[in-house]
A protein has these predicted regions:
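Helix-biased "structured C-terminal domain" signature
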Residues: 1-236
Length: 236
């Protein structure tokens, strides 16, 4: 069974956060050419059945990307509806002298192809918008209004120092990035790209909550003692 044996699975629950369940796991490890591919996966939801589906979906996405170590291979082009041949560097993690280490992937796993197209596209745009956030000055800081404040309260995050940013450079989709601090210590971040602005806000906050619980609250975050980096907070 997927969740049996020596695989590590953690579940968190708190009645103070609107019955939100958080699940994380380390189900396998893939090492190719000395590189360890992302091995952990996590999910957050009020419905336990959906919680496990989300977790397995992320696990499956990362596992398939890790196994696709070929130099080139056959694929099915959804836009052209035809078979094609594609080089490895276009569908995964890689290295080039021009860009260094890079990630070209927007991935999705599920049963509905139409939904998967949108999800994968949003993830790819989210990654590129995140690059613009970190390395340019095109992001806009969002004022935390009552709508956002209520979501933070539901997640028990309203006492934290929260910064939220908006990117919309690569199309009509909305990308939200959230940074979370407490007493000057960086705790967590979350991001989401969506056709809906409100959905992007909600999912970015949920991701930040998930990451904080999985890494910081369990004492596993490696940079928990780093003080706040004022450059990317004060100058965007």
């Amino acid at each position: 069974m997927l969740f049996a044996g020596d695989r590590k699975v953690w579940k968190s629950f708190s009645s103070y956060t609107q019955n939100i369940n958080i699940l994380s796991a380390e189900l396998s490890k893939i090492v190719i050419n000395g590189y360890v591919f992302p091995e952990d996966c996590g999910s957050i939801d009020t419905n336990k059945k959906i919680l496990f589906k989300k977790l397995f979906s992320e696990y499956y996405e990362r596992r398939i990307i890790g196994f696709n170590s070929f130099k080139s291979g056959k694929t099915w082009m959804l836009l052209g509806n035809e078979a094609d041949k594609i080089e490895r560097k276009y569908i995964g993690y890689g290295f080039s002298n021009e860009y260094g280490l890079f990630d070209t992937t927007g991935t999705a796993a599920g049963l509905c192809t139409d939904n998967l197209k949108i999800k994968a596209m949003c993830e790819l745009i989210e990654k590129n918008e995140s690059m613009l956030f970190w390395y340019t000055t095109c992001s806009k800081k969002i004022i935390i209004d009552e709508y956002i404040r209520n979501i933070l309260k539901k997640m028990n995050m309203d006492k934290m120092e929260i910064y939220i940013y908006y990117n919309n450079e690569l199309g009509n989709l909305h990308t939200i990035i959230i940074l979370c601090f407490e007493n000057g210590v960086f705790l967590s971040s979350g991001s989401c790209c969506s056709l809906s602005y409100n959905h992007a806000i909600e999912q970015a906050i949920l991701e930040a909550k998930l990451i904080k619980t999985v890494y910081y609250d369990r004492g596993g975050i490696p940079y928990r003692t780093f003080k706040r980096h004022f450059f990317f907070v004060e100058n965007i």
